């Protein structure tokens, strides 16, 4: 049986635009079409440096949807990378708190975590019509492992897109905060391995995030994360309004199929 060719991805134009600024994502997209989630599921990711406020803004968005828009709590999945599954949490501990990991091994560990997380958690929730709010996604790998390490963004983008079978969020919120301000927010105590890297590393990461956003303005919303969190929250709401129109908050998720041995 011949294999059916995938339909052109709705995000194709944005990826073509990325060729001018981020050849990594563009070159890989020629071989792995980036595909959006199913029509009734919505995927929103939050990106930025450590301490930019991603977790806070993700939680505020979730609370707003539940209290102000009456979205059922079980329709909203909040998750994080690395992590999000028992396997992922083990990988997270190794990556963030373990000993030195060689760059290629580090990239492969992040990709393994993401592949398992997307296949077992994110895609099933999207397929049931749910809303996924993610604290970091593959953009973080391109920024941290690509710009800040010894590997190129092209290599990291290719590995990351392969791991998730081309899945991209409907909207990516980039909370941009100057590197020096992030360092002050984190403080000297309790830093993990990545947070303890020098200012030069984190500046390279920030610049790569901004480059990715410039290359893909349809997916990205860049928000000044230095402002009061309520102001940032208001801009987050405005930036996700369009993609949330794809999400029907009255839709009841279809239960996942039962295994034969459960019937």
Model-derived regions: residue spans:
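Hydrophobic anchor at the beta1->P-loop junction of P-loop NTPases
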Residues: 46
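ATP-dependent small-molecule kinase phosphotransfer cores
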Residues: 68-164, 235
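Conserved lysine of the Walker
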Residues: 54
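Pre-Walker A (Motif I) flank of P-loop NTPase domains
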Residues: 39-43
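Hydrophobic positions on the alpha1 helix immediately C-terminal to the Walker A/P-loop
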Residues: 57
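A glycine- and Lys/Arg-enriched "phosphate-lid" helix/loop adjacent to the NTP-binding pocket
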Residues: 140-208
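NTP-dependent small-molecule kinase module
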Residues: 2-37, 60-62, 180-263
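Walker A (P-loop) phosphate-binding loop of P-loop NTPases
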Residues: 51
């Amino acid at each position: 049986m011949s294999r059916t060719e995938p339909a052109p991805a709705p995000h194709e134009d944005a990826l073509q635009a990325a060729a001018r600024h981020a050849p990594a994502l563009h070159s890989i997209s020629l071989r792995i079409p980036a595909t959006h989630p199913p029509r009734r599921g919505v995927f929103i990711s939050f990106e930025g440096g450590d301490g930019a406020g991603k977790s806070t803004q993700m939680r505020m968005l979730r609370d707003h949807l539940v209290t102000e828009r009456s979205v059922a709590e079980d329709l909203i999945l909040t998750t994080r990378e690395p992590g999000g599954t028992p396997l992922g949490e083990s990988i997270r501990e190794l990556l963030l708190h373990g000993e030195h990991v060689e760059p290629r091994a580090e990239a492969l560990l992040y990709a393994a975590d993401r592949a398992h997380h997307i296949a077992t958690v994110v895609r099933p929730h999207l397929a049931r019509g749910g809303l996924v709010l993610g604290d970091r996604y593959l953009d973080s790998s391109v920024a941290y492992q690509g710009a800040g390490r010894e590997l190129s963004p092209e290599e990291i983008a290719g590995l990351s897109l392969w791991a998730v079978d081309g899945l991209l969020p409907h909207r990516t919120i980039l909370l941009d905060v100057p590197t020096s301000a992030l360092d002050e927010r984190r403080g000297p105590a309790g830093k993990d391995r990545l947070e303890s890297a020098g200012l030069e590393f984190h500046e390279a990461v920030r610049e790569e995030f901004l480059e990715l956003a410039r290359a893909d303005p349809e997916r990205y919303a860049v928000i000044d994360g230095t402002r009061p969190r309520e102001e940032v929250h208001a801009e987050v709401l405005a930036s996700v309004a369009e993609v949330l129109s794809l999400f029907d908050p009255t839709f009841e998720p279809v239960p996942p199929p039962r295994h034969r041995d459960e019937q």
